[in-house]
């Protein structure tokens, strides 16, 4: 997230200039950890990486929003560590150039390929519990597809292993290599073809940046997490979001895509002689090449779009309602959200998240919320279906008044208005006004418990209209970046029929596995696909990435969950595992879901 300007506070200047992960806050933190653990010596690049940080504090705004941490503390420690080393007359290692590095530099430029371990170490790990760290021998930053082609020909000739990296959030270990890591972050071309309702995107373009440019022109694109690089995300998952209900997944998202194959040759999806990436095989597949651009579909937006949240006290009821909406094609985005997602996304601190989760479940009786995004006719249809809901006005009051949800006044108000029908208070005329009076929503109230040094900045952030707009928040998804705030998480993602009994079975089994291994766990989300015939389900296991025992238990739980998925898949023939979608994200949705 430190690579995208999602708060409007700016991005680390040295990262934008140098491009390597090491020059971003994320990389500097990984570098300091490696030095502290004695994994690498102090090198020439160490000095430059530390020196280019001016302690401006921009990363504190970004990182605290997501994780409640302040990276400048680490940046100061990094500078102090290097200064102390130099004062003691410590050696500074110079990375020697070798023939392979020389050839790479001849292709991409002197500064865009390196074997310095201060840079390599920041490409040596990902967040996943199953990943084994691998220190790459080289890191290279191509700027064009021609440079990628030349590099792959070189690696093919010299039999050098390589891996291509997006933004490093993939958690299965596929973005690491002991040979060369190819970082595509320099390739940030965005070219709109409005007459053909498409936009061509380079492999270094992040979802947030693309969505921002599309919205400026009155369009929407179906993208995933804000920091995810679009081409990599398309290749690895076919892109999934709550907008899958309206826009589809996998090949539904694109018009065309271009690739460089492992031998350095070029092909595109529209070539008749190209490899058939539209096919799907339910097994692990190798990378067909590097996606150097994708032509994504542009979707129209209307000025009357809005969002509602429909509360339910059981998963079965939430699933029945979401399927009904999908079958009737009500809404562009539909998602069943669990209490963990709801409380974590909405709250600025871990403490408030835990308290709000308890209030939602134990006081309000809300186990699940179904999100619906649509135009005025879709929202009217939801209302006509008779379910109480939080409309945009109530959502704003709830969001900015979250600390007051714990108050006796609010809970007493709900008790006085409750009836036999669950959540009936939401139907009472004038309830929005009563809620605003009881909750006293304001940006100042929402941020009252965060770090005092950052409070005024965040008060201005939460005063922006888009920060309480359900449509904007689900398009740009900056709140979902908080998912790993308390602990890192391991995801279980499957495609399956949208059947309440089957989904209930899976959730119960995923929970049983996690409980057996002593792991925090919860449902993430469920989104209908293909008119409600199928759904995508995410169930999350949480672990402390600094606790070897907890990592070990998560590894065992992940293996058990994988065995569970494969057993259901073999027995029913209708289950698809995200593991098998990796490198098959361009397959036809029909091939993915039904063949």
Model-derived regions, located:
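Glycine-rich N-terminal segment of FAD-binding domains in flavoprotein oxidoreductases
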Residues: 121, 125-187
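Short, conserved charged micro-motifs
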Residues: 147-150, 209, 315-321, 377-385, ...
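Intrinsic disorder at enzyme termini
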Residues: 1, 5-10, 72-111, 116-121, ...
